[in-house]
Amino acid sequence: MKNSIFLIPFFFLVIGCSPVERSVGFTTWSDDGTELKYHLGTEASISVVKKFDQLLQEKNYTELNQIFSDTAQFIYHNGVRNSLNEFINLNIRRDSSLAANNETLKWEPQNVFSVDLDPSSGGEHVNMMYLATYESPETKSQFYANLWLYVLNGKIVRVNQYNQSIEN
């Protein structure tokens, strides 16, 4: 009887301490159009995206291969798609043009979060918002860059980027 008395509170303690997996909202991003809910993602995927930002800030394009899948795609607001090599070449040309014209383009991360649509299958959607500042000898402008990155097994598979002008 004594054992039963001690087991009952222990049982409730174990049940009461079990984490409840929360999910909210909906999306039809699944392969077959099935409606899924959002779950919190992980710091591991956010760390991959922060590494991406760090490498871009440092203009260290050679190490990007370490955090991107072999089939990675970059998709822009106008539907243009680039491979990783095309993305790197685009950045090198941009950097050269900016330097030649005494211009700068700097960006600061504003927020980042990760959501998981199906925790049983792997892969997370990470959102990172930047405030970008372009400066030339004659002008200064800012815009927001909103990136959605799909991270699977520690590698970035896809980057979708949308920009929003900031009116002065």
Where are these regions (language model features)?
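Short, low-complexity N-terminal intrinsically disordered segments enriched in polar/charged residues
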Residues: S18-E58, T62, Q66
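A short gly/proline-enriched turn/hairpin at secondary-structure junctions
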Residues: E35, Q73-S83
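Surface-exposed, charged secondary-structure patches
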Residues: N91-P137
